[in-house]
Every structure is written in structure tokens, then in C-alpha cells.
Amino acid sequence: AIAGSLSNFFALKENEFVPNPKFIPSYKQEERNYIEAANILKDSGVDLLILEMLLDINHSEILLNAALKTGLPVWVGLSCCESKFDNSIVGRNFRAEKEKSLIYDEEKYKEQPKFLPEDEIIQFEDIIKTLTNIGGDVYGIMHTWFQDSSGGLKIIKDHWKGPMMYYPEIHKFDTSTHEAIAMSTEDEFANSCLEFIDDQIQIIGGCCGVSDTHLKKLIEKF
């Protein structure tokens, strides 16, 4: 099967991990953009749509509704982290991460990195409740470190009884060198993934830092 990818990741400022205000559309234009992109993928012959790295409610529900309009199966991938402020599970947010996933010079870049323009810290359970009430065929966690994943997967299971997927992230990114720093070996990746596979979580992949050798090792051990 061929999957088409859709995301609500915004264009960034040059050399910074901050959405560029010049390219942030209105919600109405954002909706039109998603519908156009989803239909292009459908017309190109994809078998399903995967929504990647959803972090919030407002942008995510617009994207999910646009994807569902195509009539294709929609897999909903979310990203979360355990908040350093109160240990709750929230939509992934650079401010809330206990361990920084982005390495950057704080003297050079004064503005705090952020994924979305609003930079809200949102309870992950609120995101899941909203999106599962809209629809989708598969739900899961992606672009999330192993140590943050278990809480997010549990919340999804509390509100979703359908099939689930899991695509962990295993690297940090150094903005000064533009290099990814792998945080897990192939064996560590495979062993950690195996801990999450169960009757509901059967679709396993990898996000940033995961290579074909990581996935081959997982297949060997499965």
C-alpha cells in the first residue's frame, strides 16, 4: 500500500525552529490548503493518508476533517511528551520537554523554538478526545521519544479501541551542525519497540533517526 503524508508543520524562519509569520495562513486558508493537498495525494493514487505529528486541537481537527473528506482511510499520528512542569502527558512542545530534543545556541537564538504559532501546552487527553470523536481508522504515536511514549499510548487506548500504530523518534538535532545525533542503537531500538507491541499496537515504524537497519533488527527480533 502507498501512504500519502499530511502534516500541519509550518514553514520556519531561516535557520530557526520558529514558524515564519509571513507564511502562517488564516484558519480558512489553512483548511483550503489541506483539502488541496489531500486531493492531490488521492488523485495521485495513494491508498491511505497518514497525518503526521499532530500536537494540538485547532490545527489538527482542521487537517483531520480535510483528510476524511477524501474518503480514503486516515491514520492519525500524534506526538507527545511528558511535561517538565507537572509530569502530565501533553502535545509535544519544546518548552515542556524534560530533555531537550533540539540542540541550539540559546545566546544566538533568543526566541524559544516552537512547533506551532500559538505554542500552547495542551493536555494530550484533550487532543485525543476531540480527534477520536471526529473519526479516523488508525491512531498512534509518532515523532516521540521512547520515554514519553508509554503515557501517550495509554491515553489513546483509554479512548480508542481500534488499531494503533507506533513510530518512535530516536535522535536529537544539532542546529549548529545540522546533524542528527542517534540516541539508540539498532538493538536498543528493536528491544524498546517490542515492549510496546500488543494486540492493539500492530503497526510499527520509525521517525527521525530510524534507519532501515533499525527496522531490519526489529524484524529479526519479532
Predicted regions and their residues:
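Domain-level signal for soluble alpha/beta catalytic cores
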Residues: 1-222
